[in-house]
């Protein structure tokens, strides 16, 4: 059915061979025009793609046809009803809907062994790959628009006018689908797949309230079941109506949208969330919008996760049935055996989607992101993060605060309350996990910067999305510089959230603002290294899940420069000689939530040589790669925290009175509010510019911008927090409000990753160098 039929057909499979002379004799007698050229020879080839009902291309002289038949052998009940295909195509063709013209139906199984029907061959283009290679972005977009509009047309048909009596029940379609595909799967299963059983149970318990909606549904509506005009982006035939009936229209729309969530473990296509920008392929929300506009319905579709989960469940059931026919020897395609490995990942994807809240309208771009544009995926993920924060994270703040208030004197204070662990599982199921790492999330630094701002509004939110420091920086180190063994042993469990980590750099006995002062040693000893030294401000070391430390220490080489004297090495926390000495308070706060900030001693700690990261003398090189994106994350979380502080300040200013006036009516308070808004906008833009520079130029070329935000953001937000405390009076420094804790968190950022003064000196040096280059260029 493509322009080049030979590329899509093969010799008839042995199990599907039939009597050609019998077929030819029957068609000569019953199909008008078939025998017009008595000298022409009938040739028959089989389509590769027919996995359910075998499909054949018939050629006789200038005449071309397509034959569909039932597969031979024992069949599942109510499956392979090709008479229904013929009936629906005949009805649709009569009203001008794009289908191949049905020509005849044969119920006499003696002709070729089973019932069959013949239709016209439609000459056109069929795209087997959802990315539609070989066409322009504009044409690709037009093709998808045509697909969505054709589906909307189908669902808008008046089913009564089609005169398809008893073609389908309609009402209760979703429930019947779950029941039918559960039975079909169970009848053909060759092994136990728990995800299929769990998904079946979930679907039956979460049927949509709108299950009474009915229209004509295709049942397998997807790109490779559509024939397009040879030159135009126009649908000229929709194929394969085997599963058509009266049912819920969103089942078709969800089936069309499968590729957006396709499991990466399956080789057919890549996961749609990583569809490249500017390819013309619409976002799922855009595709839905086109469909809904054509039908005149609201694009905010309820229960979308149900319909997506049902589509994956159904496809998993179909795949299981195809494999069963392969085992029985009556498969319709030579590669049917491959479907055995698709059932489980399809079911697991459906189960994951069942736990997610899926939006069906395009995200509205925030005005603050327009100067440094987000990707389409960045907009979509940010919208979902905001929704998740509103629905789940902010409502949990009180419970989390009470947990740490009550566990202050127990060992549990360094761990997480159950509610955070539940939120983490929910975020992972929603796909809102490891968003900070571009290679995993597909997000740019600008994309993630805006997400970091949102998570900065709640002190435990980064942990919910597995985007907390210092783990983000440590995971970046392992991703960029770790060996395959190091990634497998430590990066993978960190990415899963099974463990946490600590970064050990700062030392109590030296001025660590000059990192070359570091005294901790990493000495080669036979087949390993021995680590000796004292570290402090090792954040997260007290977390019960903290299993690995990245330690910066000296591996002196007399011939190397002062910045090639240090290395980084992995030290498991349970290695003999690793000792947690004491937690360090910050303005009296222990920062239990993040596992505290600890003094850690390494006393003759021996680790294998394979634990060294990248090589001896590469420590500062790794640090620069680690700290660039990390400072973006810190500063944008600070922007988010500033927004929260300003909100608290404004609430207080509106509610309280002093000297017979609301606080905001006092000019000094009004000015604090105004200056706060100005400062927030300034540091947001400066940080987004730094993120944009990393995206476009790389971390090395963005050093000045990164240093500037590291100075500007914490300093500005400290001032905003101070104003907010003033507005609250004594309450501002009490436990009744979070402002004192917020101030403590922000104030430490003026020291973390280097004090302001170090960054200011670096900025001045880079500025003078830039000015000198400009002067030289002018001369």
Curated annotation (Swiss-Prot):
N6-acetyllysine, modified sites: 163, 166, 175, 765
Residues bearing PTM N6-succinyllysine: 368, 390
Ligand binding (FAD): 503-513, 537-539, 656, 726-730, 755-757
Catalytic activity: a 2,3-saturated acyl-CoA + oxidized [electron-transfer flavoprotein] + H(+) = a (2E)-enoyl-CoA + reduced [electron-transfer flavoprotein]; docosanoyl-CoA + oxidized [electron-transfer flavoprotein] + H(+) = (2E)-docosenoyl-CoA + reduced [electron-transfer flavoprotein]; tetracosanoyl-CoA + oxidized [electron-transfer flavoprotein] + H(+) = (2E)-tetracosenoyl-CoA + reduced [electron-transfer flavoprotein]; eicosanoyl-CoA + oxidized [electron-transfer flavoprotein] + H(+) = (2E)-eicosenoyl-CoA + reduced [electron-transfer flavoprotein]
Pfam families, sorted: Acyl-CoA_dh_1, Acyl-CoA_dh_M, Acyl-CoA_dh_N, APH
Keyword Oxidoreductase set for record: yes
GO biological process per UniProt: fatty acid beta-oxidation
UniProt keyword annotations, A-Z: Acetylation, FAD, Fatty acid metabolism, Flavoprotein, Lipid metabolism, Membrane, Mitochondrion, Oxidoreductase, Peroxisome, Phosphoprotein
Phosphoserine PTM sites in chain numbering: 210
GO CC terms of this entry: mitochondrial membrane; mitochondrion; peroxisome
InterPro entries listed in its UniProt record: ACAD10_11_N, Acyl-CoA_dehydrogenase, Acyl-CoA_Oxase/DH_mid-dom, Acyl-CoA_Oxase/DH_mid-dom_sf, AcylCo_DH-like_C, AcylCo_DH/oxidase_C, AcylCoA_DH/ox_N, AcylCoA_DH/ox_N_sf
Residues bound to substrate: 513, 628-631, 754
Record Gene3D superfamilies: 3.90.1200.10, Acyl-CoA dehydrogenase/oxidase, N-terminal domain, Butyryl-CoA Dehydrogenase, subunit A, domain 2, Butyryl-CoA Dehydrogenase, subunit A, domain 3, Phosphorylase Kinase, domain 1
Protein localization: Peroxisome; Mitochondrion membrane
Name of the top EC class for this enzyme: oxidoreductase
Molecular function per GO: acyl-CoA dehydrogenase activity; flavin adenine dinucleotide binding
EC number: 1.3.8.-
Modified residues (Phosphotyrosine): 323
Location, primary (coarse class): other
Quaternary structure annotation from Swiss-Prot or TrEMBL: Homodimer.
Role played: Acyl-CoA dehydrogenase, that exhibits maximal activity towards saturated C22-CoA. Probably participates in beta-oxydation and energy production but could also play a role in the metabolism of specific fatty acids to control fatty acids composition of cellular lipids in brain.
PANTHER family listed in its UniProt record: ACYL-COA DEHYDROGENASE FAMILY MEMBER 11 (PTHR48083:SF13), MEDIUM-CHAIN SPECIFIC ACYL-COA DEHYDROGENASE, MITOCHONDRIAL-RELATED (PTHR48083)
Protein name: Acyl-CoA dehydrogenase family member 11
Annotated gene: Acad11
């Amino acid at each position: 059915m493509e322009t080049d039929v030979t590329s899509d057909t093969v010799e008839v499979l042995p199990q599907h061979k039939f009597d050609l002379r019998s077929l030819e004799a029957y068609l000569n007698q019953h199909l008008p025009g078939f025998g017009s050229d008595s000298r022409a020879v009938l040739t028959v080839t089989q389509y590769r793609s027919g996995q359910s009902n075998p499909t054949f291309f018939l050629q006789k002289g200038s005449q071309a046809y397509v034959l569909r038949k039932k597969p031979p052998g024992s069949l599942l009940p109510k499956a392979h009803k090709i008479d229904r295909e013929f009936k629906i195509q005949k009805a649709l063709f009569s009203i001008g809907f794009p289908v191949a013209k049905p020509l005849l139906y044969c119920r006499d199984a003696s002709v070729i062994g089973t019932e069959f029907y013949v239709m016209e061959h439609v000459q056109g283009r069929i795209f087997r790959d959802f990315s539609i290679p070989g066409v322009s972005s504009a044409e690709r977009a037009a093709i998808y628009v045509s697909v969505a509009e054709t589906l909307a047309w189908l669902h808008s048909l008046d089913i009564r006018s089609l005169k398809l009596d008893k073609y389908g029940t309609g009402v209760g379609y979703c429930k019947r689908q779950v029941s039918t595909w559960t039975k079909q799967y169970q009848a053909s299963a060759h092994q136990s797949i728990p995800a299929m059983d769990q998904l079946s149970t979930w679907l039956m318990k979460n049927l949509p309230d709108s299950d009474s909606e009915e229209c004509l549904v295709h049942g397998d509506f997807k790109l490779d079941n559509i024939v397009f005009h040879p030159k135009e982006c126009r649908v000229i035939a929709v194929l394969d109506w085997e599963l058509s009936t009266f049912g819920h229209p969103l089942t078709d729309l969800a089936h069309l949208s499968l590729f957006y969530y396709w499991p990466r473990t399956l080789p057919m296509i890549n996961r749609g969330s990583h569809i490249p920008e500017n390819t013309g392929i619409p976002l799922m929300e855009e595709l839905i919008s086109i469909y809904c506009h054509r039908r005149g319905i609201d694009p905010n579709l309820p229960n979308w996760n149900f319909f997506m989960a049902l589509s994956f469940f159904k496809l998993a059931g179909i795949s299981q049935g195809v494999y069963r026919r392969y085992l029985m020897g009556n498969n319709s395609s030579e590669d049917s055996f491959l479907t055995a490995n698709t059932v489980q990942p399809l079911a697991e994807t459906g189960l994951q989607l069942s736990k997610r809240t899926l939006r069906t309208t395009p995200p509205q771009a925030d005005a603050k992101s327009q100067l440094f544009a987000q990707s389409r995926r960045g907009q979509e993920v940010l919208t979902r993060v905001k929704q998740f924060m509103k629905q789940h994270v902010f409502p949990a703040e009180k419970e989390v605060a009470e947990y740490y208030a009550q566990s202050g004197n127990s060992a549990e204070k360094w761990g997480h309350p159950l509610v955070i662990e539940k939120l983490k599982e929910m975020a992972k199921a929603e796909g809102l996990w490891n968003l900070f790492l571009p290679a995993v999330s597909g997000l740019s630094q600008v994309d993630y910067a805006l997400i970091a701002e949102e998570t900065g509004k709640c002190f435990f939110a980064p942990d919910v999305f597995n985007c907390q420091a210092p783990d983000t920086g440590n995971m970046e180190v392992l991703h960029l510089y770790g060996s395959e063994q190091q990634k497998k042993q430590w990066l993978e469990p960190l990415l899963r959230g099974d463990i946490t980590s600590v970064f050990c750099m700062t030392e109590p006995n030296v001025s660590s603002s000059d990192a070359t002062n570091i005294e901790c040693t990493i000495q080669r000893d036979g087949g390993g290294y021995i680590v000796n030294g004292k570290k402090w401000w090792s954040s997260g070391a007290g977390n019960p899940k903290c299993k690995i430390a990245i330690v910066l220490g000296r591996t002196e080489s007399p011939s190397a420069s002062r910045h090639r004297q240090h290395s980084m090495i992995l030290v498991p926390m349970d290695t003999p000689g690793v000792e947690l000495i004491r937690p360090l308070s910050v303005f009296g706060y222990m920062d239990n939530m993040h596992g505290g900030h600890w003094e850690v001693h390494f006393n003759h700690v021996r680790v294998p040589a394979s634990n060294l990261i990248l090589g001896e003398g590469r420590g500062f090189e790794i640090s620069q790669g680690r700290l660039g994106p990390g400072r973006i994350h810190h500063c944008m979380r600070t922007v988010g925290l500033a927004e929260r502080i300003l909100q608290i300040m404004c609430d207080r200013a509106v509610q309280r009175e002093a000297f017979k006036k609301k606080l905001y009516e006092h000019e000094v308070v009004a000015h604090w509010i105004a200056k706060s808004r100005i400062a927030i906008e300034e540091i947001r833009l400066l940080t987004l510019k730094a993120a944009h520079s990393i995206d476009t130029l790389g971390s090395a070329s963005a050093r000045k911008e990164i240093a500037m935000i590291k100075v500007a953001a914490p300093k500005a937000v400290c001032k905003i927090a101070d104003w907010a405390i003033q507005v609250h009076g004594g309450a501002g420094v009490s436990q009744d409000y979070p402002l004192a804790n917020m101030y403590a968190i922000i104030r430490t950022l003026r020291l973390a990753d280097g004090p302001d003064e170090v960054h200011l000196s670096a900025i001045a040096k880079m500025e003078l160098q830039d000015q000198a280059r400009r002067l030289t260029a002018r001369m």
